[in-house]
Amino acid sequence: MAFSTQDSDEVLSEINVTPLVDVMLVLLVVFIVTAPLLTNSIPINLPKTESVAPPEQKDPLVVSIDGAGKLFVNKDEIQPELLESNLAAAKAKDAEVRVQLQADEGVNYGQVAKAMASIERAGITRLAVITAR
């Protein structure tokens, strides 16, 4: 009475992954055990210092030019000829005033250049031009 009808000469083409899993688990255990030892093993008591908190950063003035060419300072619409005096007053209050200039991409470059010139004439040297990524 024969139970098997297959040829006994066939080659087994499957890979035995059990030894691979065993090795990987051993490596995992080794890394888990040694990982805490990799931290600084020299105990050092660092000295405490008395430091002053850094000064608060003031919000910058935001000069905006919309698609229609209207000029805004911190969301308040102003006339272009008043920009320089408005910024000079802000410079008088805070010598370290920062200005962020943002303009719609459809705005004429000449308007942006005029706004930059007004910012420069007001004595403001910290200017950032805001763009989208």
Swiss-Prot record:
One Pfam family recorded for the sequence: ExbD
Family matches, as InterPro entries: ExbD
GO cellular component, as recorded: plasma membrane
GO BP, sorted A to Z: protein transport
Any one GO molecular-function label of the UniProt entry: transmembrane transporter activity
Keywords: Cell inner membrane, Cell membrane, Membrane, Protein transport, Transmembrane, Transmembrane helix, Transport
Membrane side Cytoplasmic: residue ranges: 1-16
Predominant subcellular localization, coarse grouping: membrane
Residues in the Periplasmic compartment per record: 38-133
Bilayer topology: Single-pass type II membrane protein
Function: Involved in the TonB-dependent energy-dependent transport of various receptor-bound substrates.
Subunit structure: The accessory proteins ExbB and ExbD seem to form a complex with TonB.
Protein name: Biopolymer transport protein ExbD
Gene: exbD
